[in-house]
């Protein structure tokens, strides 16, 4: 027996989400149906609101509904220390440690020549423009400890060291090939505390 076309369309769209296969998409679709029109409307409104209202912070490139974002507006943050991360989930992981009181810069990826991702595909130019406008003392490179993250860290070091900046790398403690997003808070806090100069 085939499912109704509207259900099939919903399953097809949900299955496009990362980590969601067809069976999980089908379970989610039936959950939405069971929850009722109110829930479905709220979910649709939340999705539409994210697409409509969320944009990049003009300073750090994180996702925000206000520009500049809350972290960039916070006068208690050390504006002279910038933690460079690959993505917003990495920023959130570092924030959960409550160990870093500087500001951030989100690259939105890592260098990956095999995948066709070069420096111009990342928010590196925006970082350089930001540093001209707002000088910093230290750049903490917190890219993932994998081949792409290491390549990105080395590339950033070669760009930033000649500018007279102290460039540090978070200490290894996060396993090689792992993502910051999935690291526990203690491991990530130790990695931040043990960062090293590049």
UniProtKB/Swiss-Prot annotation:
Keyword DNA repair: yes
UniProt-listed SMART domains: HhH1, TOPRIM
Keywords: DNA damage, DNA recombination, DNA repair, Metal-binding, Zinc, Zinc-finger
Residues in Toprim domain copies: 80-175
GO BP annotations listed: DNA recombination; DNA repair
GO molecular function: DNA binding; zinc ion binding
InterPro entries per the UniProt record, alphabetical: DNA_Rcmb_RecR, Hlx-hairpin-Hlx_DNA-bd_motif, Rcmb_RecR, Rcmb_RecR_Znf, TOPRIM_dom, TOPRIM_RecR
Keyword Heme: no
Start and end residues, zinc fingers (C4-type): 57-72
Domain of life: Bacteria
Function: May play a role in DNA repair. It seems to be involved in an RecBC-independent recombinational process of DNA repair. It may act with RecF and RecO.
Family: Belongs to the RecR family.
Record's protein name: Recombination protein RecR
């Amino acid at each position: 027996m085939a499912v109704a076309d509207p259900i099939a369309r919903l399953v097809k769209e949900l299955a496009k989400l990362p980590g969601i296969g067809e069976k999980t998409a089908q379970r989610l679709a039936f959950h939405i149906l069971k929850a009722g029109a109110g829930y479905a409307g709220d979910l649709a409104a939340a999705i539409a609101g994210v697409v409509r209202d969320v944009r990049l912070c003009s300073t750090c490139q994180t996702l925000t509904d206000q520009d500049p974002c809350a972290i960039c507006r916070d006068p208690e943050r050390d504006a002279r220390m910038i933690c460079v991360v690959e993505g917003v989930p990495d920023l959130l992981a570092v924030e959960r440690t409550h160990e870093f009181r500087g500001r951030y810069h989100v690259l939105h990826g890592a260098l990956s020549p095999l995948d066709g991702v070069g420096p111009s595909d990342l928010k590196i130019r925006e970082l350089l423009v930001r540093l001209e406008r707002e000088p910093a003392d230290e750049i903490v490179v917190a890219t993932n400890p994998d081949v792409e993250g290491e390549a990105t860290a080395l590339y950033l070091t070669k760009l930033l060291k000649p500018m007279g900046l102290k460039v540090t790398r978070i200490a290894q403690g996060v396993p090689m090939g792992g993502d910051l997003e999935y690291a526990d808070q203690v491991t990530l806090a130790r990695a931040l505390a043990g960062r090293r100069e590049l």
